[in-house]
Amino acid sequence: SRGLGDVYKRQHSGNCSIFLSGKVTEDIISRVTDTFGTSFGQHQQSASKLSFPFTAVPEKRIFIEREDAMQSAVKMGYTTITRNHPDYLKLRVLMTLFGGYFGSRLMSNIREEKGYTYGISAGIMFYPDSGLLAISTETDNEYVEPLIQEVYHEIDRLHQEPVSMEELTIVRNYMLGEMCRSYESPFSLSDAWIFIATSGLDDDYFSRSLLAVNEVTPAEIQDLAQRYLCKETLKEVIAGKKLS
């Protein structure tokens, strides 16, 4: 029985954590302890570190032919910083303004004004030790080229013109509202702390996020755009019907 107990400790509770949120009482803690035991999670396993290195292809554009496609999927992106980088929290504000919510620059121009797509987004995807800045959309085959040019146009605007305080305030209010929703219920609160634990972030991550959203300036947004939104290194991947 001792051997079975040792196997259980090593394989079933190693590298695990229990998160309790809401109205947590001593009785609840006692019941959880009785159910899982006092040694739950104490036998940490040394998991191998996973790495996902990116190797950029030399081509600026990759086209994947889909002869019968009515629309084309367009992806644009390149490698960028991770969440632990000092610039990341303010870069989040830039990416939200650029393509991270319904009123973003990309949505306002390419969807609302030009009508090239029903939706377009920009954000940062994360992998161990690396980040991927990605712009994603779908459009009619005939609009692929003008759509891509409008993406570059919006990047140029961010390089050349400081955003207005009015626009920055709208983005701030949106992001602060999203942050509030992350803590409004016991389930969302526990999800927030699970995110911290599994992403290897410090406990002050959310307070630093709040500070960054409130303090970032138009000049900083412009500087970040010039350093992290680079047309020359942006790769284009298109899957659809090639027009002659």
Identify the residue ranges that each predicted region occupies:
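Short linear Ser/Thr-Pro motifs
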Residues: S1, G103-S104
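Charge-rich, well-structured scaffold segments of protease-associated domains
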Residues: R2-S46, I81-T82, G99, E112-S244
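His/Glu-based metal-binding/catalytic segments typifying zinc-dependent metallopeptidases
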Residues: Q44-G103
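Phosphate-proximal small/polar/acidic motifs at interfaces that engage nucleotide phosphates
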Residues: M107-S108
